[in-house]
Amino acid sequence: MPSLSKEAALVHEALVARGLETPLRPPVHEMDNETRKSLIAGHMTEIMQLLNLDLADDSLMETPHRIAKMYVDEIFSGLDYANFPKITLIENKMKVDEMVTVRDITLTSTCEHHFVTIDGKATVAYIPKDSVIGLSKINRIVQFFAQRPQVQERLTQQILIALQTLLGTNNVAVSIDAVHYCVKARGIRDATSATTTTSLGGLFKSSQNTRHEFLRAVRHHN
């Protein structure tokens, strides 16, 4: 893995140790993003031709390149820890020891089984120990892990482990409520169902009062 920020390396190592890292094979060789996009575009051209689409049409001719750019630079950019957000931690000088909650964090991810959209919102809470984190960094961590092929259960746990690792405390909780387009747009084609996943650590798991306070915040969000 190329040189990473200390925070990115710590989070990656923590996820690997817990068996929660996204399934990735070791690269056969290092590849720059432009080469990667060119190869993906070539394979996408073959797929579209197998579907009998006419890539000479001006509406379709750039589609393989658009998809390749979207995969590498956007919706799968979270596969590259070089894109892990810069983290700002602040000493907890005020000795904050109550729950900090961020609600309605929008996320868009991709189902790793069918490569279609997962669209949802996250609620994240933590009880500070020695440090507090810049609030926007929580949103960025959620979005980083969402920008991968995902299953919602793993996504929820990855966000939890990342924040526990960075904040030096187990007292973190994450809940995600999302619509899966592999359910909405294909198969059963259920347009109204949603999936909720929750991952609790520390006091959020062991203390009934703390857990209920978090779940009340989640219900308020819904």
Curated annotation (Swiss-Prot):
Transmembrane segments: none annotated. GO terms for molecular function: GTP binding; GTP cyclohydrolase I activity; identical protein binding; zinc ion binding. Pathway: Cofactor biosynthesis; 7,8-dihydroneopterin triphosphate biosynthesis; 7,8-dihydroneopterin triphosphate from GTP: step 1/1. The lineage of its organism: Bacteria, Pseudomonadati, Pseudomonadota, Gammaproteobacteria, Enterobacterales. Its EC number is 3.5.4.16. Pfam families: GTP_cyclohydroI. Toroid-shaped homodecamer, composed of two pentamers of five dimers. It catalyses: GTP + H2O = 7,8-dihydroneopterin 3'-triphosphate + formate + H(+). InterPro entries: GTP-CH-I_C/QueF, GTP-CH-I_N, GTP_CycHdrlase_I, GTP_CycHdrlase_I_CS, GTP_CycHdrlase_I_dom. The keyword Disulfide bond does not apply. CDD domains: GTP_cyclohydro1 (cd00642). Keywords: Allosteric enzyme, GTP-binding, Hydrolase, Metal-binding, Nucleotide-binding, One-carbon metabolism, Zinc. Zn(2+) binds at C111, H114, C182. It comes from the Bacteria. The gene is folE. HAMAP family: FolE. Belongs to the GTP cyclohydrolase I family. NCBIfam families: folE, PRK09347.1-1, PRK09347.1-3. One of its GO terms (biological process) is tetrahydrobiopterin biosynthetic process. The keyword Hydrolase applies. One of its GO terms (cellular component) is cytosol. Allosteric enzyme. Activity is modulated by K(+), divalent cations, UTP, and tetrahydrobiopterin. Tetrahydrobiopterin is an inhibitor of this enzyme. This is GTP cyclohydrolase 1.
